[in-house]
Amino acid sequence: MRGDQKVIEQLNAALSSELTAIVQYMTQSEMCQNWGYKRLGDLTKGRAIEEMRHAEGLIERIIFLDGIPNIEVGLKPQLGSKVQEQLEIDLKDETDAVRQYNDAVKVCAEAKDDGSKSLFESMIRDEERHADFLDAQLHAIKEMGIANYLSQQLTGGK
């Protein structure tokens, strides 16, 4: 099915963002694991896996619309050298993704592409949930201090 070029461009831009997030979150997860923060590392890896599912959905949709997926990581992952910095970077990125995907919904609506619009709307809900989690973590750090927060990240389990 031939798709609208502007929609395919939005899908590819989102794919680039998702691929960047996957690399960023997987690396941050391993950093947290290496620092001994298993719980936070596991949670970060879970976010990376969700972003992989987003990338898969975007690739499927682009191909369905007879487009060619751009599978290059076009953006540079921002890792952060400390846990709080990682959380702040990730919150900004998730907030940016929500804004980007809301703009994409408008493009899809103008093109009367409800399938792509629905995909973006679903991704928005996931990114909002991620942003809410990250905001809560930063709030916890502010309330209890970084040392107390990190001590809670030492154990495994979710």
Q: Can you name each region flagged by the protein language model?
A:
Residues 1-158:
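Iron-associated oxidoreductase/ferritin-like identity signal
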